[in-house]
Amino acid sequence: MITQYKKCLAFAAMACAALSPAGAVEWSLTVEKNGATNVVTAAGNPFAIDVSLAEIGGGWSGRIVNREKGAIMLGFEVKADPQEVVEGKSALYLPHVYGRRIRNWPVHSVTQPGVQMWRETENGVFVPAMSKWDVSTGSRPAPLPYPSKLATMQWATLNDGEKGFYLASEDPLAGAKDIQVVYDSNAKRVTMGFNFPMFLPEGETFSVPRVVMKEYAGTWRTAAKMYRRWWDSCRKVVHLPASAKDFTGFFMVILKQQNGEIAWPYTEFDSLGDAALAHGFRHVEFHGWGVGGHDTLYPEYDPDPAMGGRTALVAGIKRLQARGLHVSVYSNGQLQHQGGTKWYDEKGYKCAVTKRDGKTMSEHWVKFKNHPGMTFDVACPSAPDWRAQMLKICLDAQELGFQGFFYDQIGKQWPSPCFDARHGHRPGAFVFTHDRETMLLDVIGEMQKTDPEFVLWSEAFNDTILDSVGFYQGLFYVTDAGYNVANRFVEGVSCDMFPEMTFYTFPELIMTDRNNTSLCTRTRANGCAVANLRVDFEVRYRADRDYVERGAAPAPDAYAKIRSKPSEISLMKAETWRANRDYLRCVSDFRRKHGAILLAGMFKADEGFSVKGGKKIIANRWDGKNGETGILVWNADDTSAKVSVAFGGKFVLASEPERGEVDADELIPANTLRLYKFHSVQET
């Protein structure tokens, strides 16, 4: 029973949800319960509605109509009443970048270099400090905008290992929304919810998508399964190419930089192939491959005579492919050089995301101290000319012989309102939502007509583009993923990277970590493997090439002109080059050898097995076909560890990258992976 008061609908219950639209609007709320619906309507001043979780039942949805004269911008908040946090048990799981798990709850402001922590906003109130761009102030929660790199999925959960609270938006059109989280350290409670931003012209309607808030029994994996069941009801994962079975990471090379400096011309692709294979890669991808180099002249990409021209490029691609390498190429999925191309002058100027004041949404990229950089408009994915150009450049790349096409930035961008009606949407519509998804679906549909194995890449993952994009370059502010996975052992860490959340929800997902230094340490290679991440390996500058080819440590001034230098230059030592290179290749070969499990298997995280022993052990499970199960264990400690693995199948073997098959009872050496293989898995 819902009781109406002057400005709210209130109840008495331990858990509730509140909706707070702002502005003079007419609204309605549909509350589901036991298959029936109750519709509540009202109009007037800002207000709040409180409804018990018992009343919600399956979920709710809503409708807002602007009856004001003129347009209004407003937000519609849906949030659960504060959920109790049990110190030492409760963890908050957020779909941030790779996935975030928050386990340690703060009592005061804490900062620690290299570790994502909480940010105090006012007395006893904290928000997760998810990025250096988090500018939350006062009591406003830190927004995680979906769909984007900051909120890759429409769900989150608070769980104590036995039960949890599930928050999800079941919105098949992937409309703009923010996941909001606030922690009150005095009450020891966390508040979770959604905000739906909107721009409503007079007389128009906004439909609030279905929101689910419910308590459940089980671990965080139960919440992941609930979300995946809904996702499967309205979407599907794109066909993955056969090359996915060998994909342990990719060797990315910027052939020509923004300032015109050439690091690797087309005529020297043979040595590029040597370096890629020596590091264990079967996939290469080229940035800065056109006349303009990297971060200029977008979206025009023409083979560069200075690097050898079209003939040399086509021949070089064929030679790489003859050696078993899969070759892909770069474009930017949203940037267009402002006034710098024929494209912009003829069509691009009318494709930009346009603000309410008529100014365009833009970015300025400057890579070198001796170069002015370039300004780009952000293109609207609804604009017909932009959509046509994104398909055209992909078709052009396929004609050159490329097997995959990389759209930079396309997965990371968060929704923004665009006011240019020439794009086919109403003024103020939030773009980078369903329009991004359909643009990429149109591209992959055309590409796979002639080559079913053609694959699209994206920088950054979000689940709206899983039906078109096969490979993802991760985006984690260029930090070392192996180190961050190991961060879960660092005392006092509030937030740790938790890729298990994302990969358990979408075990088909193929995504790399992110690192801007031309090396991969042993720790990083192991951390990526156990977390189901592939390895991102980037060669950006001439000094990078010298290091990956022959171990020549960079001179002190090698990166002097560069504004954003590689983050781990100090590790680029001649004496460790060969060991790092060879170990990365060893782990890559190991993952391919057991690829039916570790690369093509279904990622199950920590489900259905237990591990005892060791102080710093991370272990995850994969199920292959034909009843095979693999449990990969990483001893992240600097000393050997005695470890035992319990699983309900028949033990087959234990194997390590360097030593091959080993006795399962042997100590696992320091910073070493071990795969325990079983047969006839139990149903879970």
Please name every model-derived segment.
Residues 261-264, 312-313, 318, 328-400, ...:
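Active-site-adjacent "subsite" loops/lids of carbohydrate-active enzymes
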Residues 377-469, 480-485:
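Active-site neighborhood of glycoside hydrolase catalytic domains
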Residues 290-313, 342-381, 413-438, 443:
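Aromatic- and acidic-residue-enriched carbohydrate-binding clefts of CAZyme catalytic domains
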Residues 71-74, 121-328, 332-343, 576, ...:
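Conserved structural scaffold segments of CAZyme catalytic domains across common CAZy folds
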